[in-house]
Amino acid sequence: MIYEGKAITVKALESGIVELKFDLKGESVNKFNRLTLNELRQAVEAIQADASVKGVIVSSGKDVFIVGADITEFVDNFKLPEAELVAGNLEANRIFNAFEDLEVPTVAAINGIALGGGLEMCLAADYRVMSNSAKIGLPEVKLGIYPGFGGTVRLPRLIGSDNAIEWIAAGKENRAEDALKVGAVDAVVAPELLLAGALDLIKRAISGELDYKAKRQPKLEKLKLNAIEQMMAFETAKGFVAGQAGPNYPAPVEAIKSIQKAANFGRDKALEVEAAGFAKLAKTSVAESLIGLFLNDQELKRKAKAHDEIAHDVKQAAVLGAGIMGGGIAYQSAVKGTPILMKDIREEAIQLGLNEASKLLGNRVEKGRLTPAKMAEALNAIRPTLSYGDFANVDIVVEAVVENPKVKQAVLAEVEGQVKDDAILASNTSTISINLLAKALKRPENFVGMHFFNPVHMMPLVEVIRGEKSSEVAVATTVAYAKKMGKNPIVVNDCPGFLVNRVLFPYFGGFAKLVSAGVDFVRIDKVMEKFGWPMGPAYLMDVVGIDTGHHGRDVMAEGFPDRMKDERRSAVDALYEANRLGQKNGKGFYAYETDKRGKPKKVFDATVLDVLKPIVFEQREVTDEDIINWMMVPLCLETVRCLEDGIVETAAEADMGLVYGIGFPPFRGGALRYIDSIGVAEFVALADQYADLGPLYHPTAKLREMAKNGQRFFN
């Protein structure tokens, strides 16, 4: 053994060839934390000191190569002064450079995934051989930063600036065949031939058949582009990427600027440019929020995994109620490998559900994400039925009938008599109390809520609602099934609206107050979209459905009359009474036309102004900042109440629920992180400025206490 550490070992393989193996003890994956970086330095020094070494193969002792940096260390590191961050990155790069500058050839053998620092380690090698099932990429822009271990320097010099910009700015994982096509790797082999492939390359380099020094040289030099080529490549890319990323996500464009600025430098000077830009991005609030989101997502996955121990395996599912929603649920279950019965009382609803599933599967085939054979397999896993004949062996039933408590209670009681005693019943409801629905059941311990968001195939969140009598097994089994469907489940306790809708309706309440104060809804939409929402509140209500919003508002007003009941008519009342129901019937706040692709396109319709006129009670002058605060303050305060009331267990789950469920701007991190970014004391003072708007704007006593004590939601 030439070197042995807790993360890295170096041992002789054969005739002067050594294997530098990453295998971080006590972890399921390899990552670049302080320990690993320090051991890499020591391992490289040990190789340099051993004259018998003729070549180095870099490998992993785990199912994946290296997943990247240890993100948990970013939180503390990024609080350091900018100069210290720059120094830290340059020190790390000295280690990578020392490996790259070894007097012997080097080959990286890539298995599983090599992301971020993992791929950057491979780029420092002379050759790369990749398993045909592996994926590689530089996903740092998703964290609000860009690659900091030489990725913006080595990758453009290896695969060309255009390809490198595409890889870095998109942050996507790339398949082996695509990596080979652009020259990011030198060979692709079957997983079982990975070491043999690496040995073949290293032996050919040692023998002189391959000139490893010539292969290494372009990575040490400036980019081979003249001034005109540089201008065309970089200016075009910056314009395109800025349009794609939008103004709130600076990292992709900053990555291009870094590549451009370093284009005329050799490796060492180029790395200084990279380090300076990396440190600048690391200090932004966007990076703080996106890293916080990543860590919150990891927390969600840990909590969901904790349910696995007691969860029952779902081998056969069923959905009650076909149509678009039932078809979406059936599709999601089947495409992820769980066969599902789809029952309805009407043949036409069954057909609608099957058409929906077939359409979604067909779309995946068209995009190359699914083979026709897999599509047929998924369709065969959806069994339509008008009866309960095959329900005896079902493990979980998702009830997705009309949003009416009496209908749901009747259907749930009926199906309970048709399934085995330990089958789980889950109601897909957005507002109806799980405790209320449970009253119709003989086995309420087997009953939970399972709230899917529309469209099911696109929305990542599922709220699993625990009722007063729901057993832990029922909750755990539903969480496990949601995960199996490829969703991100969050367990919440029962209350009107659960987490997401309970928080969303105060936001809509702020919007209603603005419209009643004479503020143009088109202006409100533009302001909130600029703030970062995927769509403004008027457009969102049209998409959700004015009738759905009207019903939800009434449910919330009944549940929380002290702050959500408004005696005055609102914009939603006026539109509902005028039968302007949104996209579903072509007119809501906006009117809708069909575009060339057959999708609804919103257009302004002046007739809506007459409909809204009776509910405008005053003409207030408000700034854009007022518009944001009228809507965001009640949303944030309701999120605080959900946490205080125990509806959601942690701040991380609350924030992720809003990001995944209603598209809360990710670069702002969620409602509670948004409060933290303002400062809890400052947020309380801000809310107090709008106290005259009603109880939705009144901070809780506990929040005032947090403000007084200088506390935060995330430390």
Swiss-Prot record:
Pfam families: 3HCDH (PF00725), 3HCDH_N (PF02737), ECH_1 (PF00378). It catalyses: a (3S)-3-hydroxyacyl-CoA + NAD(+) = a 3-oxoacyl-CoA + NADH + H(+); a (3S)-3-hydroxyacyl-CoA = a (2E)-enoyl-CoA + H2O; a 4-saturated-(3S)-3-hydroxyacyl-CoA = a (3E)-enoyl-CoA + H2O; (3S)-3-hydroxybutanoyl-CoA = (3R)-3-hydroxybutanoyl-CoA. GO terms for biological process: fatty acid beta-oxidation. SUPFAM superfamilies: 6-phosphogluconate dehydrogenase C-terminal domain-like (SSF48179), ClpP/crotonase (SSF52096), NAD(P)-binding Rossmann-fold domains (SSF51735). The record marks E120, E140 as: Important for catalytic activity. The active site is at H451. It comes from the Bacteria. GO terms for molecular function: 3-hydroxybutyryl-CoA epimerase activity; delta(3)-delta(2)-enoyl-CoA isomerase activity; enoyl-CoA hydratase activity; long-chain-3-hydroxyacyl-CoA dehydrogenase activity; NAD+ binding. This is Fatty acid oxidation complex subunit alpha. It comes from Pseudomonas putida (strain GB-1). The lineage of its organism: Bacteria, Pseudomonadati, Pseudomonadota, Gammaproteobacteria, Pseudomonadales. The gene is fadB.
